[in-house]
Regions:
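Alpha/propeptide regions of enzymes that mature by internal proteolysis
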Residues: 1-252
Length: 252
């Protein structure tokens, strides 16, 4: 029941300030879901729960494939604080009542549902005031791009500067260089939103007011172009605030 779903989404909350729900209309079927998670959140293995349901008719193998793809593109690109635990679970249940569906359409709908829930978790991260998307392009491989993006996303220094709305790209460059990914400073380009602020690891002239407006928003987009290959990755994260410390300085 609709009311039962809302009650369940409410019941699984821990330090979440709001319940997290989604419904995606597919081609003749629906994928719906709920999740909880606000900290100790860097899947794999973190304190997050997500339950998805669909009325699509699909064999277990197809459901597993759709969920694996969806999780890889959503929850596994999320890092609130780089911390993990032993409690993460993502489940997908299918009733089959709507009949058979196109496999690609099912994967797309499951992925969209997972991504929405992951974005809701980032927005509700403990103490967070901003959602931050760290995009890395031009890496030697997707794996190295993920390594580099995750290093920036998990940096306490970078997170503090985002909270302070300070576009200090030097911290980003430092984390990229220490990440283990191949980084050639002479090729590195860093942008906030659509504004290039560093080229070849050297500051470039730009409209500071445009960057300031971007930093003041609720969503910050950062792109790090490494220029050494075709690999790319995006990590979804957030800023680090005093409220996060207040929440976690004791046992919760």
């Amino acid at each position: 029941a609709i009311t039962g779903a809302a009650d369940a989404a409410e019941a699984i909350r821990t330090t979440d300030s709001v319940r997290k729900e989604v419904a995606i209309d597919g081609d003749g079927f629906t994928v719906a879901g709920m999740a909880k998670g606000a900290a100790m959140l860097q899947p794999n293995m973190a304190t997050m729960l997500a339950v998805l349901t669909t009325d699509a008719l699909a064999p277990p193998e197809l459901l597993a494939e759709a969920l694996t793809t969806g999780v890889a593109r959503s929850f596994n690109t999320l890092s609130v604080d780089g911390c993990t635990s032993t409690n993460d679970t993502v489940l997908l249940f299918a009733s089959g009542r709507s009949g058979r569906v196109d496999p690609d359409a099912l994967t797309d709908a499951v992925t969209a549902a997972c991504l929405s829930l992951a974005e809701q978790m980032a927005a509700d991260a403990e103490g967070a005031t901003k959602v931050v998307r760290v995009n890395v392009t031009g890496a030697r491989s997707d794996a190295e791009a993920d390594l580099a993006a995750r290093a920036v996303a998990n940096s306490a220094l970078c997170k503090c500067s985002w909270f302070g709305e300070d576009p200090y790209w030097g911290r980003i460059a430092s984390e990229l260089g220490a990440s283990g990914a191949m980084v050639d400073p002479s090729l590195l380009r860093i942008s906030y939103g659509d504004t290039l602020v560093a080229d070849g690891a050297v500051a470039v002239a730009h409209d500071a007011s445009v960057v300031a407006t971007h930093m003041a928003g609720s969503v910050i987009e950062i792109t790090c172009a490494l220029g050494v290959g075709n690999g790319s990755a995006t990590i979804l994260t957030n800023d680090l605030t005093h409220a996060y410390i207040d929440e976690n300085m004791g046992t919760s």
